[in-house]
């Protein structure tokens, strides 16, 4: 394997005051007539950069462009899911402790809510996301739909056992709901109703998942699980 890092600070600064100084100063959405409330935030810009990396890798003979995976942790986990959802060239979609705005269902979620994330990081998302801060149930979509957009490609999610802010149950429930679409490609695929114990990863059909013992983080254990999953599909 080879690793390619997307340096987000060079694309769109992760800063409430400076985020529009990067690529968003050029790709404003104004020319396309996109209303202000629906225009990209930083996560959209970072995901765009991920696809531009794929563009480059396709031109380099030392890489197999049919075997590209994407991953990220926390805000980068949200980004990986969004990039993977939009770019079908990505063969394996992986995300680590992505929580609100990522793999976790908004409805019934504990820990971080839309009101929290849009107060602390309003620039990550389009402005319309904050319209559901007071009524998450009114949002017409939820995380399982984002996850399902990876199908039929292999998808791997990871949570952390004491990551209450991300809500591991909301992440796992979204994964189970998304798996219903995967049954169109893998008949009989059924994920366990109860989430697995910590450090007990599973691969079922084209879906992988684990809960790592510990806090909101990305560790060597997580990478080991990701590589084991990729071995099944990319080697």
For the regions a language model picked out, list residue spans one by one:
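Cap/lid segment of the alpha/beta-hydrolase catalytic domain
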Residues: 1-62, 106-107
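Alpha/beta-hydrolase fold nucleophile elbow
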Residues: 62-74
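Conserved strand-to-loop "acid loop" that flanks and positions the catalytic carboxylate
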Residues: 151-168, 212-215
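Active-site loop->helix "elbow" adjoining a glycine-rich segment at hydrolase catalytic centers
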Residues: 42, 74-77
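C-terminal catalytic histidine-bearing segment of alpha/beta-hydrolase fold enzymes
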Residues: 130, 175-235
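Short glycine-enriched nucleophile-adjacent loop
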Residues: 50, 58, 77-88
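Mobile cap/lid helix-loop segments that gate and shape the active-site cleft of serine hydrolases
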Residues: 30, 95-146, 171-193
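Short, proline-enriched alpha-helix->beta-strand connector loops that line the catalytic pocket
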Residues: 149-155, 203-207
């Amino acid at each position: 394997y080879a690793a390619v890092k997307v340096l987000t600070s060079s694309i769109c600064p992760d800063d409430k005051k400076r985020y529009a100084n990067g690529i968003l100063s050029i790709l404003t959405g104004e020319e396309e007539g996109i209303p202000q409330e629906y225009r990209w935030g930083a996560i959209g810009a970072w995901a765009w950069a991920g696809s531009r990396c794929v563009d480059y890798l396709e031109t380099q003979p030392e890489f197999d462009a049919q075997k590209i995976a994407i991953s990220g942790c926390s805000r980068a986990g949200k980004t990986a899911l969004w990039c993977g959802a939009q770019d079908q060239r990505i063969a394996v979609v992986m995300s680590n402790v992505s929580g609100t705005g990522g793999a976790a269902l908004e409805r019934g979620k504990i820990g971080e809510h839309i009101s929290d994330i849009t107060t602390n990081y309003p620039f990550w998302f389009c402005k319309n996301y904050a319209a559901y801060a007071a009524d998450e149930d009114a949002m017409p979509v939820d995380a399982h739909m984002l996850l399902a957009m990876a199908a039929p490609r292999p998808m791997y999610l990871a949570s952390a056992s004491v990551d209450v802010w991300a809500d591991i149950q909301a992440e796992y429930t979204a994964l189970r709901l998304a798996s219903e679409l995967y049954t169109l490609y893998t008949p009989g695929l059924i994920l366990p109703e109860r989430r697995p114990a910590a450090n007990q990863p599973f691969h079922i059909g084209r879906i992988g998942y684990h809960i790592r013992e510990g806090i909101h983080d990305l560790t060597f254990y997580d990478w080991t699980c990701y590589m084991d999953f990729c071995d099944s599909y990319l080697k």
